[in-house]
């Protein structure tokens, strides 16, 4: 099979090294095929469904994927932990208070150090974790999102931080957490940059 050329769908195109006068290459092309999976490239990330083709789900296109004025940049992070631990962190609003605000000092804004009041909401396979903090004269509600099995979004860390009047703020990252083994996982994600208060009509009491 050295040097053989296959098409994206697994069909044999060329079999160099085989006798061109032999029937074997022709038979091989009709009976042998590599496994192949269709992919979707979107905003610098490649998505594949590796189950039975007839069960391929529709690609989920959430509103956060195409926001006017927001620039998305793909990135990858390797974690030396189980993938469930990463999902647990996104659904634990308290971790930002201690990890990013108290034990290691202020990493984002002072508002992160406040524990606040916690609420959790379940909508089918979607979960929301809300942390409502009082920051001086403001009330800041930060929401993190998990859609099973591995899609997460985190509330804004800078554009909306409880230090000024803001009625709406978009997520700071959009991320998929992929298990590698029991002790390692990879996050494939977009960092979201720009005016995260978009759309502006949300930034009013009426909106």
Residue spans of the language-model regions?
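C-terminal catalytic domain of Rieske-type non-heme iron oxygenases
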Residues: 45-47, 53-207
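Rieske [2Fe-2S] iron-sulfur-binding domain
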Residues: 1-71
């Amino acid at each position: 099979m050295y040097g053989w050329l296959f098409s994206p769908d697994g069909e044999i195109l060329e079999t160099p090294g085989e006798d061109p006068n032999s029937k074997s290459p022709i038979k091989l092309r009709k009976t042998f095929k590599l496994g192949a999976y269709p992919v979707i490239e979107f905003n610098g990330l490649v998505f594949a469904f590796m189950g039975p083709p007839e069960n391929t789900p529709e690609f989920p296109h959430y509103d956060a994927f195409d926001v006017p004025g927001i620039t998305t940049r793909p990135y990858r992070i390797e974690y030396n932990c189980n993938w469930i631990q990463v999902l647990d962190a996104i659904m634990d609003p308290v971790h930002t208070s201690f990890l990013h605000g108290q034990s290691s000092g202020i990493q984002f804004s002072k508002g992160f150090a406040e524990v606040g009041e916690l609420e959790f909401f379940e909508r089918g396979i979607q979960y929301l974790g809300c942390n409502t903090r009082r920051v001086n004269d403001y009330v800041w509600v930060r929401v993190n999102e998990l859609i099973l099995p591995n899609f997460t979004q985190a509330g804004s860390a800078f554009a909306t931080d409880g230090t000024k009047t803001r009625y709406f703020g978009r997520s700071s990252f959009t991320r998929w957490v992929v298990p590698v083994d029991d002790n390692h996982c990879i996050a494939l994600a977009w960092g979201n940059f720009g005016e995260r208060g978009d759309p502006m009509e949300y930034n009013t009491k009426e909106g």
